[in-house]
Amino acid sequence: MNQSSLLAEFGDPITRVENALQALREGRGVLLLDDEDRENEGDIIYAVESLTTAQMALMIRECSGIVCLCLTEAQADRLALPPMVVNNNSANQTAFTVSIEAKHGVTTGVSAQDRVTTIKTAANPQAKPEDLARPGHVFPLRARAGGVLARRGHTEGTVDLMQMAGLQPAGVLCELTNPDGSMAKTPEIIEFGKLHNMPVLTIEDMVQYRIQFDLKLA
């Protein structure tokens, strides 16, 4: 069965997006799947402005461990975050910047609480480059302008979701894994979503939603 048929129990694409937006407004997480012919993976996504230590602990425990902070290009520029490498030749052109740590309010930087502190520091609209140390235990990602209509990635999906929900345009993501360390696929992602009260949606759902409602996002 493909993504569409497996996700049918969650409603049509528009309903799935609206359920995800409501969950984010309520401070809950969502699960975002990319295309089956791309990574074909699902990421847990939380809004930065409501992110809790307990939510971060769940991400660290249930996911790959590489917790990423999705930022607009403007915020990444404000923080003077350069690309992780000069020549990005990764398969999906994931726009990693140098990793970061908050300069104040953290110990080693690796605990759930410390990572939340770093993330909230970096996402603050008034943040300055000197508020952050480099490298660190949080991995910022630059969302491409135009969002999922420009690049069908989890990074763009995350920032688009925050803007569509009327939230600060910053979110965290991490790839969901199975207990044996393998990557979770659609059936496992659906079961995880049911267990943790997280709506499941796809990048394709978001593309359809934005086109149908002619949503122009930053």
UniProtKB/Swiss-Prot annotation:
InterPro entries: DHBP_synth_RibB-like_a/b_dom, DHBP_synthase_RibB
Binding site for Mg(2+) 1: 39
Gene3D superfamilies linked: DHBP synthase
MF-aspect GO terms: 3,4-dihydroxy-2-butanone-4-phosphate synthase activity; magnesium ion binding; manganese ion binding
A single cellular component GO annotation: cytosol
This protein's record includes keyword Metal-binding: yes
Keyword Zinc: no
Spans traversing the lipid bilayer: none
The enzyme's E.C. designation: 4.1.99.12
Catalytic activity line of the entry: D-ribulose 5-phosphate = (2S)-2-hydroxy-3-oxobutyl phosphate + formate + H(+)
Disulfide bonds, paired cysteine numbers: none
Pathway the protein contributes to: Cofactor biosynthesis; riboflavin biosynthesis; 2-hydroxy-3-oxobutyl phosphate from D-ribulose 5-phosphate: step 1/1
Alphabetic keyword roster: Lyase, Magnesium, Manganese, Metal-binding, Riboflavin biosynthesis
A Gene Ontology biological process term: riboflavin biosynthetic process
Site features described as Essential for catalytic activity, chain residue numbers: 137, 175
Cofactor(s) this protein cannot do without: Mg(2+); Mn(2+)
Binding site for Mg(2+) 2: 39, 154
Similarity field: Belongs to the DHBP synthase family.
Complex formation: Homodimer.
Known function: Catalyzes the conversion of D-ribulose 5-phosphate to formate and 3,4-dihydroxy-2-butanone 4-phosphate.
Name of the protein in question: 3,4-dihydroxy-2-butanone 4-phosphate synthase
Organism: Vibrio cholerae serotype O1 (strain ATCC 39315 / El Tor Inaba N16961)
Phylogenetic classification of the source organism: Bacteria, Pseudomonadati, Pseudomonadota, Gammaproteobacteria, Vibrionales
Gene: ribB
